[in-house]
Amino acid sequence: LQFEKILDALPEWDHFYTVDELDQRTMTLAEKYPTKVTVTVEGQSRNGHPIHVIKIGEGKRTGLFYACPHPNEPIGSLVADHLAEILCQDDELLNNLDMTFYLIKCVDPDGTKMNEGWFKGPFTVENYARNFFRPASFEQVEWSFPVDYKTLHFDSPLPETKVLMKLIEDLHPDFIYSLHNAGFGGVYAYISKDLPAWYDTLYALAKKYDLPLSLGEPEMPYAIKLADAVYKFPSIKDAYEFLAENTDKDPGQIIRAGSSSYGYSQQFCNPLTLVCELPYFYDARVDNLSSSDVIRRDAVMARLERTEKLFASLKTEYDVVAEHITHTSSLRTAVEHYFETMPDNLQAEKSYAAKSPDMEKMATVAELFDNEAVNPFYHLLLLGMVLRLLDEARAKDPRPEFDAAIDAAESIFKAHHEAVVANLDYSVIPIRKLVGMQLGAGLEALAMI
């Protein structure tokens, strides 16, 4: 590892910064290093919050780092915040990297503020789920870049996305680091170019921080595996073709969203684009490659059937009060988008699992664990959003129908939470390890350009 000294000097964090705290730290940094730091406001969020871009260095190469591409993913905000500090403090590092850095600590401030209820802890599955928010796909900064592919036509980028579009168009970056993270599982990565030497550094970093690799089911069934826990950067076109092959519906009507920064950048440049996913919670089974006694296809199909049943019960409760929810909000849009698109996505996964030869083998313990335990964890997050939406609606219109719906949804949430926790032996990963892993992965990658 080339950057061991930097990683060993990382401080401890016991919480995540709020959007306002990140902004204040940016202003403080600019005041402390006025000759090294330039801060500009390159746009505003939908709610009018300024999006600050930090420029550091005058290198020949250009790197674009942006955090909170999904607002429930704040690990990268600490990475960007700390990287800005060390670039100002370490002239030798900045000169050796020969890169002009453009850093955005939070590209979705509105959505991130809606997650701040869990940023200070306690870091439990329940508190995370009850305070979780993730927008509908077409309102996600990462997936609202323009695209025109077959029947998929999307040209409604968010104001936040337009900030990234302009930076990509103007800078033609050599390196784009979209600072995502997962919720539960292990470390895995998406990369736009096949760099075997970097895979070794990823594994070395995971070993350094005692973090498991995610060796179970891939996040996306169509992801192309380059190495253990490393996948070729997916495109919206890949998602389209997967749906075209596995459903009888128009993929454009199922996706209803745009491209990513990676897809958009291909029109202007060919940057090394990286995502290093890592979780808040983990269980030792996520990287257990020993064989289970369950066929992988059976594990996947059982998971999809459980998802359908949960979806149906939740949709039934929601439909009772849906007509009374009259306000517009990002929570409502997210929940209703899930209800609208989930059946077709489940059908596509079923079709794929039924015919894929990869499903004929015995599932590893990691694959079985993903299907039986990790997937229900993510369903709990949807349940949390439904509860938040119902609370939001009742606050605007305190009618008894909402009381009954909230009681029913709360019962479903509690039962599902109990089942999820009973099936997990989870630990909370120290934030310092997560920051070190993601920061180290990025530094090692850009050094290979």
Language-model-derived ranges and their functions:
Residues 1-51:
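Short glycine- and acidic-rich boundary segments immediately preceding or forming the N-terminal edge
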Residues 80-89:
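Short, well-ordered amphipathic alpha-helices
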Residues 52-60:
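Short beta-strand-to-loop junctions in surface cap/lid or active-site-entrance loops
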Residues 64-69:
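Short glycine-rich or small-residue beta-strand-to-loop segments that form or flank ligand, phosphate
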Residues 70-77:
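Di-metal (Zn2+ and/or Mg2+/Mn2+) metal-binding site signature of metallo-dependent hydrolases
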Residues 1-16, 156, 160, 196-449:
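C-terminal accessory segments enriched in acidic
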Residues 60-62, 75, 88-199, 203, ...:
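Active-site/substrate-binding loop(s) of hydrolase catalytic cores
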Residues 70, 108, 182, 219, ...:
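Catalytic metal-binding/acid-base residues of hydrolase active sites
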